[in-house]
Regions:
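Short alpha-helical segments used as structural interaction elements across diverse proteins
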Residues: 4, 74-76, 93
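Short, low-order "capping/linker" segments at domain edges
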Residues: 92-100
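Short, surface-exposed ligand-recognition loops at beta-strand->loop->(often short) alpha-helix junctions
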Residues: 9-20
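An amphipathic, aromatic/His-enriched active-site/gating alpha helix that lines ligand/cofactor pockets
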Residues: 24-38, 54-89
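Short, well-ordered beta-strand segments in beta-rich or mixed alpha/beta enzyme
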Residues: 2-9, 37-67, 100
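Residue-level signal for secondary-structure boundary sites
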Residues: 14-16, 60, 94
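A general secondary-structure junction signal
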Residues: 43, 88-91
Length: 100
């Protein structure tokens, strides 16, 4: 099982665009309905910082191969004030995590 947390900060004028890319990824995930990946995206209180959490069996290809995900990540650095940093993690505990 692979678990990754990604954090970055976009410029204020690109925050809505970034959020639109993220929404497109979730629309494609809903259509494809892969069972080997869990994925969550969060916008932090400042409105420009984002966190993504992924848990996947294998490498996460069900997510990373989606056309919307490729479009989202293709030029993400152009939107960023602070570039993405990825960190693998191990969960310590969780309870009913989120409802969207």
């Amino acid at each position: 099982m692979r678990r990754v947390l990604v954090r970055y900060k976009v410029t204020a004028d690109r925050a809505a665009e970034n959020e639109a890319f993220i929404c497109a990824v979730f629309r494609e995930l809903a259509q494809a309905a892969p069972t080997d990946v869990r994925y969550c995206s969060l916008k932090l209180e400042d409105g420009v910082s984002f966190v993504h959490i992924m848990e996947a069996e294998g490498g996460g290809g069900s997510l990373t191969e989606l056309p919307a995900f490729k479009a989202f990540t293709a030029k993400i650095r152009d939107r960023c004030e602070e570039p993405p940093t990825a960190t693998e993690f191990s969960p310590v505990g969780a309870y009913r995590v989120f409802t969207v």
